[in-house]
Swiss-Prot record:
Superkingdom in the source lineage: Bacteria
NCBIfam families found in the cross-reference section: PRK04069.1, rsbW_low_gc
Organism field: Halalkalibacterium halodurans (strain ATCC BAA-125 / DSM 18197 / FERM 7344 / JCM 9153 / C-125) (Bacillus halodurans)
Matches recorded under PANTHER family: ANTI-SIGMA-F FACTOR RSBW-RELATED (PTHR35526), SERINE-PROTEIN KINASE RSBW (PTHR35526:SF9)
Protein's job: Negative regulator of sigma-B activity. Phosphorylates and inactivates its specific antagonist protein, RsbV. Upon phosphorylation of RsbV, RsbW is released and binds to sigma-B, thereby blocking its ability to form an RNA polymerase holoenzyme (E-sigma-B).
InterPro entries assigned to the protein according to its UniProt record, in alphabetical order: Anti-sigma-factor_SerPK (IPR050267), HATPase_C_sf (IPR036890), RsbW (IPR010193)
Listed name of the protein: Serine-protein kinase RsbW
EC assignment: 2.7.11.1
Catalyzed reactions: L-seryl-[protein] + ATP = O-phospho-L-seryl-[protein] + ADP + H(+); L-threonyl-[protein] + ATP = O-phospho-L-threonyl-[protein] + ADP + H(+)
């Protein structure tokens, strides 16, 4: 079985909110070219925008850039968002949220911190690595039946940068 190397598109943009729209337009065009459905394209745009907004809001005190790479396979797209800003502690993040009580109205939920859960819901696989900055890898398969049954949440394991 021959493994095909993915086509890769890379971009670096300032970590400023006005560039999140540029990234959304870029990923929309790429996903459309690959043949994703309208709903999947919208999900991908939201997930990528959330990841970029996290960089804008949390990675840097001032200035800085975010790197994006789009790895295009026959059956999926892997999107990697990186920054060189403040590292992210997943365990501390989980503890800060506390348990979510489903019996309470949504207005009573703690504000903020739901971006990663939204990303995890919209994408098929999510992996995060914290080191000198954050690397967030998100995968969306073209077909639902290609999603690996073992994918069950946000993974804080090592993600190799491609």
């Amino acid at each position: 079985m021959r493994v095909h190397q993915p086509e890769t598109i890379e971009m670096t943009v300032p970590a400023k909110s006005e560039f999140v729209g540029v990234v959304r337009l870029t990923v929309s065009g790429i996903a459309n070219r690959l043949g994703y459905t309208y709903d999947d394209i919208e999900d991908i745009k939201i997930a990528v925008a959330e990841a970029c907004t996290n960089v804008v809001d949390h990675a840097y005190d001032e200035g800085g850039t975010m790197g994006l790479s789009f790895h295009l396979y026959e059956d999926r797209m892997e999107i990697i968002v990186t920054d060189q800003g403040q590292s992210f502690d997943m365990d501390a993040f989980r503890e800060s949220l506390g348990p979510i009580d489903g019996s309470k109205p949504i207005q009573d939920l703690k504000e903020g911190g739901l971006g990663l859960f939204l990303i995890n819901t919209l994408m098929d696989k999510v992996e995060m690595k914290e080191d000198s900055g954050v690397v967030l890898a998100m995968t969306k398969f073209l077909q639902r039946d290609e999603v690996d049954n073992r994918v069950d949440g946000i993974s804080a394991t090592q993600t190799e940068q491609r």
